[in-house]
Amino acid sequence: MYFAGGMTMNIQIFGTSKSFDTKKAQRWFKERGIKFQMIDMKEKGMSRGEFDNVCRAVGGWAQLVDESAKDKDTLALLQWLDESQQADKLFENQQLIRQPIVRNGRLATVGYCPDAWEKWA
């Protein structure tokens, strides 16, 4: 999809079908006629490269953590691991990641962020 200035939007939405915010993100892009690729995190998840790029884009792995995730044991474990192990543990346990993750090339957001997406257009 091309916009003013010739910028191309290549939107990927990472989330699950049960996530209310993921559904809202899909609706936001559909209403604006912006094509996107939906990746179900329960089926596929993020590759390590995608995970690392999202971490860089949002200011670190800690921005991705869903503090209200159901897996309280792994959530607690994250706090006690060495810093070098924390990102690896989060990557291995993607059910702890806030949804949706929306990527546009090197840009990314965590959660429902229509104000940020508006700036991409």
Write out the residue ranges for each language-model feature.
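Thiol/selenol-based redox catalytic cores and closely related redox-interacting motifs
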Residues: M41-A121
